[in-house]
A protein has these predicted regions:
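Short alpha-helical donor nucleotide-sugar binding micro-motif in glycosyltransferases
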Residues: 178, 289-290, 297-302
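Carbohydrate-associated surface elements
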Residues: 190, 209
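Nucleotide-activated donor-binding/catalytic signature segment of Leloir-type glycosyltransferases, i.e.
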Residues: 272-290
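Aromatic "clamp/platform" in nucleotide-sugar-dependent glycosyltransferases that forms part
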Residues: 310
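Conserved acidic donor-binding segment of nucleotide-sugar-dependent glycosyltransferases
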Residues: 342, 346-353, 362-368
């Protein structure tokens, strides 16, 4: 089978962490179906993103566009099965202006699809990640040759403000992506419920895949102190301000309690000022932006992971923490409810520093209640490459079989 994947977000030179889950799912599919050809069609994503707020970022995008040549890419990662990456560079920009340059991304995707077909023959199914732009692009591509496509949604919140109509619902282009898809998938039950609330189809719930080989339980943590770790962009959605307030509310401890914050973003200055105001600046370590190869070591060195998000459709970092054998504390904000169990951590309401502090205190005073080996085994069984890859492969097989049967019936 030939699968053409269209990700709205994908790792790039400027943002190596963005859309890492899309690449991991492509790798998962190639792993469990080594006889298939899995082709990822990209346009550069963050590398070609123009910014109204940063002339420097826009200049870098223009230079990248001028220097980048289209074609097959190397470096998809060590994958037992055939994973192939295509790049046709295009510029993009905010969704508020001309749909972020979606027409140019469509032309790039048409070229990538043609190159994939020239090398491997007819594409059997297109798999788009995120309803816009990739889902909308898939609808345009599928309308021409009659290709079926699968749409997996990750958007948080759904829909993005720039993709809402005057009543807060999905704009027509986003609705089209769902309505024309052969199957629609959400990465969590909460997201599926949200999608259906708008009258859109959502047939399946399949979680994001995590490469378990990157993470392992490790005794690198320092017994003389307790380290909480959080990882994510420093934006309001991630609730780092709530986490800092919770840290300030922890009662005195017999050993030092530290918070390591991985990630960068526009809120960094304000968050550092808040830490100083709360008097916890000496207990916080700002790690800055981390590359994918750097994150496993930080998971290994912490004692527990905290995610204080205001909303999440999944929460890949929670699965990564569990694969590292670390208990988690998270907010009940969507995706975490599908990940956190009494055996691996605690859930609290979002935007509640007091409740978060109570949960953090419970974890740091009784870490022995969490079995690192058992937590990892459970996470691998639910979110590992093979586990998720098999579910995605079965979905692709189901869609292609239905499309083939419909073609036979129509030709009878």
């Amino acid at each position: 089978m030939n699968v053409f994947m269209l990700p709205s977000w994908y790792p790039s030179l400027r943002q190596p962490m963005a859309g890492l889950f899309a690449r991991d799912q492509a790798r998962a599919l190639a792993l469990v179906r080594p006889g298939w050809n899995v082709v990822v069609g990209g346009w550069g994503h963050h590398d070609g993103a123009l910014s109204l707020r940063s002339a420097g970022d826009s200049w870098r995008a223009l230079v990248w566009r001028a220097r980048t040549r289209p074609g097959w890419q190397a470096g998809a990662g060590a994958t037992p099965g055939p994973l192939h990456e295509l790049l046709t560079p295009r510029l993009s920009w905010t969704l508020a202006l001309a749909q972020g340059g979606a027409r140019g991304l469509l032309s790039a995707s048409r070229r990538n699809l043609a190159l994939a077909q020239a090398r491997f023959g007819a594409i059997d199914v297109v798999h788009a990640h995120v309803g816009f732009p990739a889902g909308w692009i898939a609808a345009q591509l599928a309308a021409e040759p009659g290709l079926p496509y699968v749409l997996t949604e990750h958007m948080s919140p759904f829909p993005f403000p720039a993709l809402q109509d005057g009543h807060g619902g999905p704009v027509p282009a986003l609705r089209l992506a769902f309505e024309q898809a052969a199957a629609t998938v959400a990465v969590s039950a909460a997201l599926a419920e949200r999608i259906r609330a708008f009258g859109l189809p959502c047939s399946d719930v399949i979680p994001n895949a995590v490469d378990e080989a990157r993470f392992a339980p490790d005794a690198e943590s320092d017994p003389a102190r307790f380290v909480f770790f959080t990882l994510g962009a420093l934006v309001p959605q991630k609730g780092v301000d709530v986490l800092l307030r919770a840290l300030a509310q922890l009662p005195p401890q017999p050993r030092p309690v530290k918070l390591h914050i991985g990630g960068d973003g526009p809120e960094r200055g304000a968050l550092q000022a808040l830490a100083a105001t709360l008097g916890v600046q000496d207990r916080v370590r700002w790690l800055g932006a981390l590359r994918p190869e750097q994150t496993p070591a930080h998971f290994a060195r912490c004692d527990a992971f905290v995610l204080a998000s205001r909303h999440e459709t999944f929460g890949v970092v929670l699965a990564e923490a569990l694969m590292s054998g670390k208990p988690v504390v998270a907010t009940r904000c969507g995706g975490p409810q599908d990940i956190v169990t009494p055996a691996n951590g605690l859930l609290v309401p979002p935007q509640d520093p007091a409740a978060l502090a109570v949960a953090m205190q419970a974890v740091l005073t009784n870490p022995a209640r969490y079995d690192a080996t058992a937590m990892r085994a459970d996470a691998v069984a639910r979110f590992g490459l093979r586990a998720v890859g098999e579910r995605v492969a079965a979905l692709c097989e189901r869609v292609v079989a239905a499309h083939t049967a419909a073609g036979r019936k129509g030709g009878a």
